Amino acid sequence: LQQSATWLAQHRPGYRLLVLDALRPQRVQERLWAELAGTPLSLYLAEPTRGSIHSFGMAVDVTLLDPLGHEVHMGTGFDEMTRASHPEYEAELLAQGLLTAQHLTERGWLRAAMRHGGFHVLPTEWWHFDFGDKAEVRAGMPRVL
């Protein structure tokens, strides 16, 4: 994460990363799963027996802060579980006028910074980034309970 923050500071002076969510203990994941079971929002959660990468400490949710310390508008809010949050649909949403070129530019800066730190983007959440191979993480690392 430090590599991502350093890259951003070098390439976009004044802008910083803001961590919104990181380590999520297994018990919290189970509680979220139970609360959202049977709703469309459950599609955005990892099934607890499989495990969220957050529960292994290998995922982070981040956004950008501008030079004044304000969150940069990304077209949707953090944890807004809608199609407009999906990076995979950005071009389509831009064409429909549901996202702006500025939203995509800001998301692009965030992704570039995170990729320079070795993170991978999730196709359904512009704010979520995984570190490492999910299968290897689940097979070889302990979960925080």
Features from the language model and the residues they span:
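Cell-envelope/glycan interface and biosynthesis
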Residues: L1-L145
